[in-house]
UniProtKB/Swiss-Prot annotation:
Expressed in metabolically active tissues such as liver, muscle, adipose, and heart and different brain regions like cortex and hypothalamus, expression is acutely regulated by the nutritional state. Pfam families: PA (PF02225). The lineage of its organism: Eukaryota, Metazoa, Chordata, Craniata, Vertebrata. This is Protease-associated domain-containing protein 1. Plays a role in the modulation of physical activity and adiposity. One of its GO terms (cellular component) is extracellular region. It is found in: Secreted. It comes from Mus musculus. Glycans are attached at N121, N171. Residues 1-21 form the signal peptide.
Amino acid sequence: MSRGAAGWCCLVLWLPTCVAAHGLRIHDYLYFQVLSPGDIRYIFTATPAKDFGGIFHTRYEQIHLVPAEPPEACGELSNGFFIQDQIALVERGGCSFLSKTRVVQEHGGRAVIISDNAVDNDSFYVEMIQDSTQRTADIPALFLLGRDGYMIRRSLEQHGLPWAIISIPVNVTSIPTFELLQPPWTFW
């Protein structure tokens, strides 16, 4: 093998390892499936924060997705006890994405999913960025379309449930297209 070919071979072998070690970045999608309640048993698409937060090192087969109270999660959470070791669903607005992520992290959450506060948003992903402070967050932070967040919250309210049960992350490449349970209100 020539010296140039050996160099390219090393690069090709190293690149997938580098991507796997660093996880998803902006414009990558992460998928999760709601397992319960059944009326929203769909696979949802989210995007990771651009320059803060951690990555998923574990696949959670069943974990609670707990809507934060208050929904904007800019301070103390009245249901913070339920967020410990679970994933919080919060709404955009009131404070920075990083501030919301830190509030959930301080309550022991494993990750935060921040849905757009524009409930009619069914196609535009917002780029979540650092807030120019020196603060950091270690848990994954994901952005969810406003329509998706609204539909999850609405279903929980209709059923009188304090949380949804989800599986995250979901590898959609291993699911046949006809089996993908996509929300009927969202274009893929």
